[in-house]
From Swiss-Prot:
GO terms for molecular function: syntaxin binding. Acts as a component of the GARP complex that is involved in retrograde transport from early and late endosomes to the trans-Golgi network (TGN). The GARP complex facilitates tethering as well as SNARE complex assembly at the Golgi. PANTHER family: VACUOLAR PROTEIN SORTING 54 (PTHR12965), VACUOLAR PROTEIN SORTING-ASSOCIATED PROTEIN 54 (PTHR12965:SF0). This is Vacuolar protein sorting-associated protein 54.
Amino acid sequence: MKAMEERTVGLISASSSRASLKTQLENGYPRICDYCEPTIEFLSSSELARHIRQDHTTQEGGSFLCRYGEHGVCQKLPLEGVCDVDFEAHIRRCHTSQSVPYSRSTSCFTEDNEEAASLRSIRLTSDRDTPTIEKKKFTLHSFTQNLSAVLADPSRSRNDLSTFFTRHWGDTFVPTQPVPTSKRLAKMADASFDSYCQAAGESYKRYQAVKRALRLSHTEGTESGNERQDAEDLPTVFIDPRFTLGDSSTFSAVFTVPANENLDALKQTLSGKNVIPATPLEVAINKKPGEFRDYEALQNRLEMMHDVVDGRLAGKLVAKTDDFWQVVRSYSGLQEQLANALQCVMVVRKNLKHVDELVCDQTKKIIEVHQKYEQKKHLLAKLNDIACLREAQSTVQMMLSQGDYPKAIECIETSLDVLSKELNGVTCFRHLSSQLRELYSVIGRMMNEDFTSLIQKEFGVKPEAGTLIQAEGELSAVLLGLMRMRKYTFISVLREEIIEGVKSVMRHVIKSQILNSGVDLSDFDPSLTQLGEPVRRMKHADFLKTVRAVMDEEYFFCKRLEALQDILLETAQRAHPSNRHGSEDIIIERLEEAKLNESDSDDETGSFSKSTSSGGFVSGSAVNSNATATTLLSIEVRSEAFLKRVLPLIAEFGHQCAQQRISRLLIARAKNASVTEATTPTQLSECIAIVKEYQSQCEEEGWYSTQNQKAGGLGRAINKLSMDYIEKFHAARKMRIGNMLDTELWKATDVSIIDQNMVDQAIETGMLRSSKRIDDGPTKKPFKRTGSSATIDSGTSVSNQTGIIVDEESFVVVGSSITMIQILADYCEAISKMPTFAQDWNSRVIELLKTFNSRCCQLILGAGALQLVGLKTISVRNLGTIFVNLTLAGRSLELVCRFIPMVHDEMDRVLPDDRKSLLRYFKGVESEYRDHVNEIAIKLISVIAHYTTNCLGMWDVKGNIPSPEFQQICRHMLKFHNGLTGIMPRDQIESLFRQVHENFKANLREHVTGMGIRPHDTLKYGYVTQDYMYYQQNVKNMESCRNLELESLNDIMFD
C-alpha cells in the first residue's frame, strides 16, 4: 500500500506537469470506449461520436442502427433504425454528453502508455485520501444478461425470438406426464403420520416456549445494562442538535409551565422513561399555564440531569482510555514512517530524473532520427514512382507488342492507383490519368476482338491427334486480361460460337454420310443447304450410321469444350484468387436469380412431356426446378460471382446444344409418313439404344448436372418419336382389323404355312412373334396337315390348309381371326423391343382386343348379322348358313382367347413392379371372350331347340311310322351335326348335342303329356315309342353322338 501511494503521488504530479502543455479539455473528457478491447481513449465528444459512427453503427438501406451497448444493441434506439439526422442527435443525447464515472474521466492525456494505464486503473474514493485499485469481482451475476437486449439481438432469427420462452418447456411449463412414485420410498399410513405429528408437535411447542423466554431475558438485560448509557431517557429538547435558548419556543418550553402536562418538554423522551422524575416540591406547587416554573425546583432538576450526563460521559471516557493512549503512542511511529516515506520519494524522484536524462532523451533522439529516415525513404519511393510513371505508356506499348495483355493491364492499374493515392495533385501528370484510361479501354476492345478470332479459329479447324485446344497459351493470356478488367462479354461471344460450332459439326458429318450412302442427289441443290429431304431418303442402316457419327463428333466437340472450360476456370482462379463479394455482386446475383426462376418454368415444361408411361424418357413430375446451363448462359454476366457460377457449365451447355441439333435430325426424318410406316419396332429400338448409349457417355462426363436425361432435349425428342410411332402403329392395326371385319363373309379361310409356323413357334417358345422373325434359327419345313394329323412336307411347299393347329387342336376360323393373331404378334414384338413404353402398349392392346370382341359379337349376335351375309329372313334353307356362321365366330373368338395369356406374359415381363396392376385388364378381356363364346353356344342350342319345338308342335300320332315330323327333326339334327363337323372339336359337338337332347326330352314329355297319351293307351303309346326309337337310331348314327346315353321313353316320361 505504501508503494502504491508513492507511485500514485508521482504519477499524479507527472501528469499534472504535462497537462499544462495540452489544450483545455471538455468537461468529462478524456474518456474511453466501454465496449472495445483494447481500450481506446477519446479527448473530445467529436472523436467519440466518430468512433461510434465507424465501429458501433450498421446501415440498412437509409436507416442507421446503433450497436453501442451490451451485446451490440442500444436500448435507447428503435430496432428499425432512424435517419442520419436523428442518429446524430441520438449520439449527442445518449452517448457523448452522458456523465461518466470518475475512474474514466480523471485519466489525463499522456504520452507514456504505462503511466496512462496505471492512472486508469486507480480510483480516488470520496471518504479516503489514499488511492485504491478497482477490481471487478466475479460473482454469479456475471452470467446474467439484459433480457431486452437478448430479445433484440439482430444475430438471432425471428423464429428463435418468437419461441424464446417456449421452445424448451412448451407453452404451459407443466410436465405432461405425472412423476411416478419412487420404489425406494416406503408407503406410510395416516396413523403413523399422526403419531409423528403429536410427538414432534410437543417438542416444537417446548422449543417455542424456551425461545420466547430467552428473547425476553435478552431484551431485559440489554435495557438494564444500557439504561445509563443511552440518551433515550433524556428530554428530547436538550438532545436536539438545533437547541438554543435564543429561540422563543425553546425558551418557553423549558422555563414556562405547559398548558397540558402531557406535553411538558421536560418529560418527553424517546423511550418514554424520564431519568429525573418530577420532585414532590415541584408537584405541590400549582402554577398556571404560561407562568415561569419554580426556580429552585427547576434548578435542582437541571443539576441532576447535568450530573447524570456528566457521569455517563465520564464512563465512556474511561472505557475509551486504552484506545486513546494507544493512538497517542502510535503517533510518534507514524511520524517516523512519514519521514522515511518522504526520503524514499525524494530518492525515487532523483532516480527518475536521472533515467529521464539517460534513457528518455536518448530514445527521443533515436525516434527523431528514425522518423527523418522514414520520411526520406518515402520521398525516395515517390521519386521512383515518378520515374516509373514517366515510362508507363512506353512500357504498356512494349507489352502489347509482345501480346502480354495481363501485364499491360496490371501496369495501367498500378499506375492509376499510384496517381490517385501517392502522386495525387502532381501537375506534370495531370493528363496521364485520362490517357491511361483511354488506353485501358482500347486494350479491352482489342482483347475482345482477339478472343473472337481465336475461338472461331479453334472451332473452325479440327485439332491434331492428342490435342484438344491448339492456341491454349494465347487464349489464357487474353482471358486473363479480360477477367482482370472485369469485361465478361466474352461469355456471350463464346455462347454464340458454341452454337455455331455444334451446327457446323453436325452439317459436315451429315453431308459426308449423305455422299457416302449413295442417295440420288439429282433432285437437290449441289451445295446441300437443305438436308431434311436427303436424310429422309436414306436407308435405315445408313441413317443409324449417320446418327452414330453425329453423336461421336458432337461428343468429341464437347470434350474440346471441357478442355476450354478447364482453361477458363484456371484463368478465373488466377484473375480473382480471393472469394470476396461486394454488395453490388450480391444485388446482381439476386436479380439474376429472380430472372432464372421465371425462365425455368418456360424452359423445362415442353410439349414433349405428354407420355403417360412411367418408364418413358419424360414424366410429368420430371420438371427440374433448377436453372439449366442454357438458361444460365443466356443471361448477361456482370459479376465475378455469376462468372464463377457459369464457367463450370460451358461443356454442359455445348452438350445441350448438341442434344437439340440431334433431336432435330431425328424429328426431320420422322416427318415423312412413309418412313414412319416402314419403320419397325426393331429399327426404332436400335435408334433408342444408340441415343441411350450417347446419354450414358455424357452422364459419365457429368454433363447432366443441371438437367437430367429425361428432361433433356434429346430424351424428350425420343419420347415424342416413340409416342408418335405407337399411335400410328396402333391406328394402322386398328384400321386393318376394322376393315377385315367390315368385309368379312364369315366363311372358313385357308391358313398359310407361314401363319401355322408362327403359331407353332409361339406354342413351342411361349412367346408370340411375327412370322418375319422366324428366321433366326434353322429353317423350319412347312407343315402339311390332313384332318387332325399333321406331317412335315420334305419340300418347300407353300400350300395352305383349311384350319390352324394350336397344340394338337384344329381351329377352322375366319380370316379376320388369323389377322388378329398376326396383329397380336406384332404387338408382342413391339413390346419386347420397346419395354420402356409397356404401359402405353398395354392400353392399346386391351383396346384392340375389346374392339375385335365387340365387333364380332355385334356382327354375329346383333342386328347386323343377316344383312352382313346377304339374308333377309332365317328359313330352313339358310338355317345351315347361319349355324355355320355362328360356329365359325365362336371358334374364331376361342382362337384369339388362346393367345391372350401369351400377350399377358409378354407384358408381365416388361412392366415394372409398381405397374403390375395393369395386367388385370387382360383377365377381364379374356373373361369377356369366354362369355361371348358361351353366348354363341347358347345361341346354337336355342336355334336347334326352336326347330325341334316347331316340329313337335305339328306332330300328330297316327299310323305312319316314323312320322314325317320326326323324320324332319332327325334330318335337321343331321344337318346341324354335319355343319358343326370339321369346325368344332368332337367333344364340343357331343356336349352341344347332349344339351340339345336334354331340351328335346323336356319338349317331348311336355307334348306327349299335353296330348293325353298314357302307357295304358297301347296303340298311341306304341306309335310314340316307335318315333322315339327312330330318333334314337338317327342320333346314334351321328359320329360325334355315338357316346351319348339315350334314355328310353318310359324313363323320359316317368323320371
